[in-house]
Amino acid sequence: MGIRKYKPTTPGRRGSSVSDFVELTRSTPEKSLLVAKPKTGGRNNTGRITTRHIGGGHKQAYRIIDFKRYDKDGVPAKVAHIEYDPNRTARIALLHYADGEKRYIIAPDGVGQGTVVVSGPEADIKPGNNLPLRNIPVGTTVHAVELRPGGGAKMGRSAGASVQLVAREGKYATVRLPSGEMRMVDIRCRATIGEVGNAEQININWGKAGRNRWKGIRPTVRGVVMNPIDHPHGGGEGRTSGGRHPVSPWGKPEGRTRNKKKASSRLIVRRRKSGKKR
């Protein structure tokens, strides 16, 4: 993919950019793999906001992605199309299996129209093939990695993401995640060879707030600019710094770390590097 930059015809256009979408081969999705995606506005079944900063945005249909590929072991599939997916940053590939079934997978880098991919323990080590970590050479770059055998891909699914298999000992393999975290994963877990395509997506400049609204993202307002009724940091004459340790809108201390009592925490070899606190 490439990035197309706009000329500064308006303040919102100045500096903004968009993908050129040259890798896409079809503009309409496979209807049999679509399901409705109702808008929630961040509300739950009682109508209360459970997730802030969500609302509006363009209407979308959810594409059913095959994150497991277990039941297609040994069945070759040809990549029929590379398509756009509004629900994720990565592109998706439509597979036509030899038995006639059609499925979507996340499109790996280097996999295009006409490429043949296959899943299973005996698959070759080439981009797009899916096989257990026990059958993948150490040092290989993979993506769409499972956390538990049979649970479906959970890690390394966004545009440009790659996970490296750095070691294998006993019944566990050690992988390095895009965040820098290193963790152990059962060697029966599956991964797809190669890295996710559309890596240039991170360089897109959205240009104006409205483009985020098209994606269903509402503004994030700081507590210190609110009124006292709306946030513990609100109020005061003129600009204030808050006057207390950072808290959530409900008074809970902010900046908490991960739950150290989580069962899977023992599998984390090295934590991700955290950014500078501001």
Curated annotation (Swiss-Prot):
List the SMART domains hit by this protein, alphabetically.
Ribosomal_L2 (SM01383), Ribosomal_L2_C (SM01382)
The family database entries (SUPFAM superfamilies) matched by this protein are listed as: Nucleic acid-binding proteins, Translation proteins SH3-like domain
Q: What residue ranges are annotated as transmembrane? A: none
Which InterPro entries does the entry mention? NA-bd_OB-fold, Rib_uL2_dom2, Ribosomal_uL2, Ribosomal_uL2_bac/org-type, Ribosomal_uL2_C, Ribosomal_uL2_CS, Ribosomal_uL2_dom3, Ribosomal_uL2_RNA-bd_dom
GO cellular component annotations of the record: large ribosomal subunit
Arranged from A to Z, the UniProt key words for this protein are:
Ribonucleoprotein, Ribosomal protein, RNA-binding, rRNA-binding
GO terms for biological process, alphabetical: cytoplasmic translation
Q: Which GO terms describe its molecular function?
A: rRNA binding; structural constituent of ribosome; transferase activity
Location of region: Disordered: 1-20, 225-278
Regions of compositional bias (Basic residues) in chain numbering: 258-278
| Stretch forming the signal peptide | none
Q: What this chain does, per the record?
A: One of the primary rRNA binding proteins. Required for association of the 30S and 50S subunits to form the 70S ribosome, for tRNA binding and peptide bond formation. It has been suggested to have peptidyltransferase activity; this is somewhat controversial. Makes several contacts with the 16S rRNA in the 70S ribosome.
Assembly mode: Part of the 50S ribosomal subunit. Forms a bridge to the 30S subunit in the 70S ribosome.
Protein family per UniProt: Belongs to the universal ribosomal protein uL2 family.
UniProt protein name: Large ribosomal subunit protein uL2
- Species of the source: Cutibacterium acnes (strain DSM 16379 / KPA171202) (Propionibacterium acnes)
